[in-house]
Amino acid sequence: MSSSSKASASSSLSSTATSSTSATRGSDGCVVCDSTASCPVCASGEYCVMTSLTCDKCPSTYCAKQSDSQLSSLSSSSSSSSSSNSNEKTSLIVGFTVGIVGGAMLIALVALYFINKRYWKPKRQKNKALKLEEASQSYGNEEEYFDDEDDDDEDDEDDGGMRKDESHTLFNTSLVPPTLNVPGNRSSASTTRTRASNILPIAYIPGVTSGLSTDKLQSKLRSSSKRQNAAGDIRSHITLGSSILDGLDDEDDEHNQVLNKDADDNLITAIRAKPKLVQIAEEESDKEIQDLDVIEEQTEADDLSHMAKSEASHGNNDEDDDEEGSFILDLEIPESIRESTQGSRTESPFEDKFEIHDER
């Protein structure tokens, strides 16, 4: 410390001492300070120091020289404060910059979305529709691919639904790919809108095959019909087999049981016939024609004997044949007609044009 500072310090201390001794004391016995102490003007490298207030002494100030440790602490504190201030400023600048950039990007994205929705998207759709329309026109008229040529007039509900689908398809033709309107796909579109089928239902009817030629067979049938339809050989019975009347008998079974109780006198006597199928070998020869003549003669004799037996047993079998599924009509031919038609061919309304008898 310099001599001047020491002198000033000593003078200040002496003055404070004299002031403290000369100062008045209060009721508590402590000195009463009249004014606050003020720091003097210190030289470079010095700092102002104030003493503490005690009961016997008022505070005093003086200049003291700064030490190296105090200077380093002051410099470090000042540097730390300045660095903290700079860090705060940097963080503020970075945050402000990020906020500005993020806000600008958000505004740009929103603007692009609205521009795309209002201008760019309708323009792209319009260009696409024009291209598809040009492509569809290059394949021909569009309306001919949607003609509904339905032959089924009863399916009106489906036709109405198809008309709705057709109108909807025509309305959205610009949005449909052009490959759907190609003429090659027309057949598939027409088949899906109709109930037509490519399958023809054919019922199998079992028949009798014959190896005889048409001319020979017709000549044999004519000769057999001439022999069978003589004046005295007119048939007086018609027999309907059970294969024809079985369906009706099954449906009316319960109804007939009720009627049988009240109408026993109106019952019809019937006999049941059993149909047979005969297969003729497919061989064209004169021997078969001769065999056919022999068979026809035998069957004629059998028919005559069978008719005689049936007429004899007809009266005895009325009660036994009440539940059968066929009936017999008895026709009486006057003798005058029989005598007048002898020697001539008479056609019967019940004539069997084609008969095939079982081989015995």
UniProtKB/Swiss-Prot annotation:
Record's keyword terms, sorted: Cell membrane, Glycoprotein, Membrane, Phosphoprotein, Transmembrane, Transmembrane helix, Vacuole
Glycosylation sites: 172, 185
Bias (Acidic residues) ranges: 141-159, 282-302
InterPro entries per record: Membrane_anchor_Opy2_N
Subcellular location: Cell membrane; Vacuole membrane
Compositionally biased residues, Basic and acidic residues: 303-312, 348-360
Chain residue ranges for the region called STE50-binding: 266-345
Transmembrane segments: 92-112
UniProt name for this protein: Protein OPY2
Organism of origin: Saccharomyces cerevisiae (strain ATCC 204508 / S288c) (Baker's yeast)
Lineage: Eukaryota, Fungi, Dikarya, Ascomycota, Saccharomycotina
